[in-house]
Design a protein with these regions (language model features):
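Exposed beta-sheet edge/beta-hairpin loop segments within beta-rich domains
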Residues: 84-93, 157-165
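C-terminal tail/extension regions appended to the core domain(s) of diverse proteins
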Residues: 3, 10-13, 166-193
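Solvent-exposed amphipathic alpha-helical surface segments
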Residues: 16-20, 137, 141, 180
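Oligomerization/assembly interface segments of phage tail-like spikes and tubes
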Residues: 93-108, 164-179
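Acidic-leaning, charged glycine-interspersed low-complexity segments
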Residues: 73-76, 118-177
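Short, cysteine-centered beta-strand-loop-beta hairpins and adjacent loop/turn segments enriched
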Residues: 85-88, 106-111, 178-185
Protein backbone atom coordinates (compact mmCIF):
# COMPACT_ATOMS: atom_id res chain seq x y z
CA UNK A 1 0.00 0.00 0.00
CA UNK A 2 2.82 2.43 0.79
CA UNK A 3 4.32 1.76 -2.63
CA UNK A 4 0.94 2.48 -4.23
CA UNK A 5 0.84 5.82 -2.41
CA UNK A 6 4.38 6.57 -3.57
CA UNK A 7 3.54 5.91 -7.22
CA UNK A 8 0.23 7.79 -7.01
CA UNK A 9 1.86 10.98 -5.72
CA UNK A 10 4.81 10.58 -8.12
CA UNK A 11 2.47 11.55 -10.96
CA UNK A 12 2.36 15.16 -9.73
CA UNK A 13 5.92 16.60 -9.81
CA UNK A 14 8.18 17.07 -12.80
CA UNK A 15 9.50 13.65 -13.80
CA UNK A 16 13.15 14.69 -13.42
CA UNK A 17 12.63 15.35 -9.72
CA UNK A 18 11.17 11.96 -8.81
CA UNK A 19 14.07 9.50 -8.83
CA UNK A 20 16.66 12.09 -7.82
CA UNK A 21 17.27 11.56 -4.12
CA UNK A 22 14.86 8.64 -3.69
CA UNK A 23 16.23 5.88 -5.90
CA UNK A 24 19.88 6.84 -5.53
CA UNK A 25 21.23 3.29 -6.00
CA UNK A 26 19.43 2.68 -9.28
CA UNK A 27 18.99 -1.04 -8.55
CA UNK A 28 18.46 -3.36 -5.61
CA UNK A 29 18.00 -7.01 -4.68
CA UNK A 30 14.48 -6.12 -3.59
CA UNK A 31 12.11 -7.16 -6.39
CA UNK A 32 9.79 -4.22 -5.82
CA UNK A 33 12.62 -1.73 -6.47
CA UNK A 34 12.71 -2.45 -10.21
CA UNK A 35 8.93 -2.59 -10.38
CA UNK A 36 8.64 0.86 -8.84
CA UNK A 37 11.33 2.29 -11.13
CA UNK A 38 9.38 0.99 -14.14
CA UNK A 39 6.18 2.50 -12.77
CA UNK A 40 7.97 5.85 -12.42
CA UNK A 41 9.25 5.58 -15.99
CA UNK A 42 5.66 5.01 -17.13
CA UNK A 43 4.67 8.31 -15.51
CA UNK A 44 6.79 10.23 -18.04
CA UNK A 45 3.72 11.86 -19.60
CA UNK A 46 1.95 12.66 -16.32
CA UNK A 47 3.61 15.56 -14.50
CA UNK A 48 0.17 16.75 -13.38
CA UNK A 49 1.68 19.69 -11.45
CA UNK A 50 5.01 20.19 -13.28
CA UNK A 51 5.82 23.36 -11.36
CA UNK A 52 6.67 21.03 -8.46
CA UNK A 53 10.33 20.35 -9.13
CA UNK A 54 11.21 17.65 -6.58
CA UNK A 55 9.65 14.71 -4.74
CA UNK A 56 10.36 13.55 -1.18
CA UNK A 57 8.54 10.59 0.37
CA UNK A 58 8.84 9.03 3.79
CA UNK A 59 8.52 9.40 7.53
CA UNK A 60 11.92 10.51 8.78
CA UNK A 61 12.59 14.20 9.39
CA UNK A 62 16.34 13.53 9.22
CA UNK A 63 15.99 11.99 5.74
CA UNK A 64 13.77 14.88 4.70
CA UNK A 65 16.34 17.39 5.92
CA UNK A 66 19.21 15.63 4.11
CA UNK A 67 17.20 15.54 0.90
CA UNK A 68 16.01 19.14 1.06
CA UNK A 69 19.51 20.39 1.85
CA UNK A 70 20.54 19.10 -1.60
CA UNK A 71 17.70 20.54 -3.66
CA UNK A 72 16.56 23.88 -4.94
CA UNK A 73 13.09 25.15 -5.75
CA UNK A 74 9.75 23.57 -4.95
CA UNK A 75 9.12 20.10 -3.60
CA UNK A 76 6.31 17.68 -2.83
CA UNK A 77 6.77 15.85 0.47
CA UNK A 78 4.36 13.02 1.27
CA UNK A 79 4.44 11.78 4.86
CA UNK A 80 2.39 8.73 5.75
CA UNK A 81 1.38 7.92 9.29
CA UNK A 82 -0.41 5.38 11.42
CA UNK A 83 -3.25 3.18 10.17
CA UNK A 84 -6.29 2.95 12.46
CA UNK A 85 -8.34 -0.21 11.88
CA UNK A 86 -11.95 -0.48 13.05
CA UNK A 87 -14.15 -3.52 12.46
CA UNK A 88 -17.01 -2.67 10.12
CA UNK A 89 -19.37 -5.44 11.28
CA UNK A 90 -18.96 -7.33 7.98
CA UNK A 91 -15.79 -9.26 8.83
CA UNK A 92 -13.63 -6.50 7.44
CA UNK A 93 -12.03 -3.25 8.56
CA UNK A 94 -12.52 0.38 7.83
CA UNK A 95 -8.95 1.65 7.80
CA UNK A 96 -7.97 5.26 8.30
CA UNK A 97 -4.46 6.34 7.44
CA UNK A 98 -3.03 9.77 8.19
CA UNK A 99 -1.36 11.30 5.16
CA UNK A 100 0.28 14.73 4.98
CA UNK A 101 0.86 16.13 1.50
CA UNK A 102 3.18 19.14 1.64
CA UNK A 103 4.15 21.41 -1.21
CA UNK A 104 6.84 23.87 -0.20
CA UNK A 105 9.53 26.00 -1.71
CA UNK A 106 13.09 26.17 -0.48
CA UNK A 107 14.25 29.78 -0.35
CA UNK A 108 17.63 31.34 0.23
CA UNK A 109 18.69 32.46 3.70
CA UNK A 110 18.25 36.08 2.70
CA UNK A 111 14.71 35.74 1.26
CA UNK A 112 12.54 38.67 2.25
CA UNK A 113 8.89 38.70 3.33
CA UNK A 114 7.58 39.37 -0.18
CA UNK A 115 9.47 36.36 -1.56
CA UNK A 116 8.04 34.21 1.24
CA UNK A 117 4.54 35.48 0.47
CA UNK A 118 4.98 34.67 -3.23
CA UNK A 119 6.28 31.19 -2.34
CA UNK A 120 3.26 30.65 -0.08
CA UNK A 121 0.85 31.77 -2.80
CA UNK A 122 2.44 29.54 -5.45
CA UNK A 123 2.58 26.48 -3.21
CA UNK A 124 -1.02 26.96 -2.06
CA UNK A 125 -2.10 26.87 -5.71
CA UNK A 126 -0.08 23.67 -6.23
CA UNK A 127 -1.67 22.02 -3.17
CA UNK A 128 -5.10 22.98 -4.51
CA UNK A 129 -4.30 21.27 -7.83
CA UNK A 130 -3.23 18.07 -6.06
CA UNK A 131 -6.36 18.17 -3.91
CA UNK A 132 -8.55 18.59 -7.02
CA UNK A 133 -6.91 15.54 -8.64
CA UNK A 134 -7.40 13.53 -5.43
CA UNK A 135 -11.08 14.50 -5.37
CA UNK A 136 -11.57 13.51 -9.02
CA UNK A 137 -9.73 10.19 -8.59
CA UNK A 138 -11.67 9.34 -5.42
CA UNK A 139 -14.95 10.23 -7.13
CA UNK A 140 -14.06 7.87 -10.01
CA UNK A 141 -13.24 5.11 -7.47
CA UNK A 142 -9.58 4.95 -8.51
CA UNK A 143 -8.20 5.14 -4.96
CA UNK A 144 -8.79 1.96 -2.95
CA UNK A 145 -7.02 3.57 -0.01
CA UNK A 146 -9.29 6.63 0.14
CA UNK A 147 -13.04 7.04 -0.17
CA UNK A 148 -14.81 10.11 -1.54
CA UNK A 149 -15.79 11.48 1.86
CA UNK A 150 -12.30 11.48 3.33
CA UNK A 151 -10.83 13.52 0.48
CA UNK A 152 -13.36 16.30 1.03
CA UNK A 153 -12.94 16.33 4.83
CA UNK A 154 -9.41 17.62 5.15
CA UNK A 155 -7.37 20.53 6.36
CA UNK A 156 -4.78 22.73 4.66
CA UNK A 157 -2.24 24.17 7.09
CA UNK A 158 0.82 26.39 6.61
CA UNK A 159 4.21 24.70 6.42
CA UNK A 160 6.99 26.92 7.74
CA UNK A 161 10.40 25.48 8.52
CA UNK A 162 13.23 27.89 9.23
CA UNK A 163 15.53 24.87 9.63
CA UNK A 164 14.70 23.72 6.09
CA UNK A 165 14.45 27.28 4.70
CA UNK A 166 11.10 26.18 3.29
CA UNK A 167 7.64 27.71 3.12
CA UNK A 168 4.44 26.21 1.79
CA UNK A 169 1.27 24.32 2.67
CA UNK A 170 0.29 20.87 3.90
CA UNK A 171 -2.90 19.04 2.94
CA UNK A 172 -3.78 16.90 5.97
CA UNK A 173 -5.86 13.83 5.07
CA UNK A 174 -7.42 11.01 7.03
CA UNK A 175 -7.72 8.57 4.15
CA UNK A 176 -10.43 5.96 4.75
CA UNK A 177 -10.61 2.72 2.82
CA UNK A 178 -11.95 -0.79 3.28
CA UNK A 179 -9.29 -3.15 4.70
CA UNK A 180 -6.51 -1.48 2.72
CA UNK A 181 -3.99 -4.01 4.04
CA UNK A 182 -6.17 -7.05 3.13
CA UNK A 183 -5.83 -8.29 6.71
CA UNK A 184 -9.17 -10.11 6.80
CA UNK A 185 -8.53 -11.86 3.49
CA UNK A 186 -5.16 -13.07 4.78
CA UNK A 187 -6.75 -14.21 8.07
CA UNK A 188 -9.42 -16.22 6.19
CA UNK A 189 -6.73 -17.86 4.08
CA UNK A 190 -4.74 -18.75 7.22
CA UNK A 191 -7.84 -20.24 8.86
CA UNK A 192 -8.25 -22.63 5.91
CA UNK A 193 -4.70 -23.97 6.29
Amino acid sequence: MLLDLFVYFAQFPATAGIKKGIATKGKSNMEEYGTILKAIDNLEDKQLVPEIENYVYGQSFDELKQRIDKLAGSFLFVDYGEVDMQGDGHRSFECTQRIAVTVAMKLSDNADMLERMIANDRTLQMVAKIHAHLMADAERGNLYWMDRDSVTNCEIVPFVSAELHSYGWTLMLSAKGADILDTHQLARRLMRE
